[in-house]
């Protein structure tokens, strides 16, 4: 993270997301500020609040994608939730504190995977020795026999590494995994049922081992996982996970506009103002109890987003507005943006479809005028019907390539080594009537 300046972060986001420079700069600064905070003396570090962000923009313009790419870039615990899934404390449904509990689970998995990767070579060596022990009889004690046994072991080790023994069956002792007790959790009670499951599993599981007959390939995988788990210090892992969540955690709250109170209608709404009020202490800073320990939310970065079609940011309660100090407006996408989305990002949509059809032996070539026409059709349909942003490109491309994809195997034989060329005329042929007919495009595109 130390080497990632705001310019580097924006540059990396540009590889995957077209436009929306203001939003990219805002999240890049928020991420860099977290690193800067960690360099401060401890007394001042505690006073620096995270730069929470409110993203405002229509659907399909890149709000969620920016947050998703940012999390990968930061290599930090990240969770995306929808505000509409939560209810006020005391009502049936999930309460907002479950966001932090879920974030802790993400952090535990992230750090455990890293730790297992770190001790991978040790686990590989231990698994290899156990497989060889199962393949060969116990070593003899006299010197001449011991040398012979060692030579045989090295021969088998070479065969094992080269995969020659993968399909051979052996008897191995592995930890038994007794069938767990599944408890259907009512909304909001996931934490309690998780604790009950842990309690029952500990009561019924004394780490018993059993012998299984497995192929070497499967046995190696099981034993490697078992050996890797032995090298992981679970207590230390919990401490590191709590620290990672408290100082590096990112929570992305989507559909925040759906819990904004519209107009001056009377009465309380369980899934609106109550959820906003419950979010306040979480965003401002509170302590949440999880099964791994107490987690402080003071320095978790919160990014909220919403389209705000039927409501405005000012419809959020004032206290919540104050806790999302940085506001970024994302602009609607133009036909030129659509054209860039189809070609510029790494693993763009057109590259994905080409790669998928290449697996059938069909070489697809999409011309520039074809891409221009696809972008125009997608933009026109958005203008005439519901504007769903760049997601419309998925629908248009899927419809355009439907027949080609269905007949890909026969087309591959027909075209041999020649590419199948798609141009603007092909777009008009496949989509022209649908795009021009508003009623049809409303239901099909």
UniProtKB/Swiss-Prot annotation:
SMART domains: AAA, ClpB_D2-small. Gene3D superfamilies: 1.10.8.60, DNA helicase RuvA subunit, C-terminal domain, P-loop containing nucleotide triphosphate hydrolases. ATP binds at residues 18, 60-65, 254, 319, 391. It comes from the Bacteria. The keyword Chaperone applies. Belongs to the ClpX chaperone family. HslU subfamily. ATPase subunit of a proteasome-like degradation complex; this subunit has chaperone activity. The binding of ATP and its subsequent hydrolysis by HslU are essential for unfolding of protein substrates subsequently hydrolyzed by HslV. HslU recognizes the N-terminal part of its protein substrates and unfolds these before they are guided to HslV for hydrolysis. A double ring-shaped homohexamer of HslV is capped on each side by a ring-shaped HslU homohexamer. The assembly of the HslU/HslV complex is dependent on binding of ATP. HAMAP family: HslU. This is ATP-dependent protease ATPase subunit HslU. The gene is hslU.
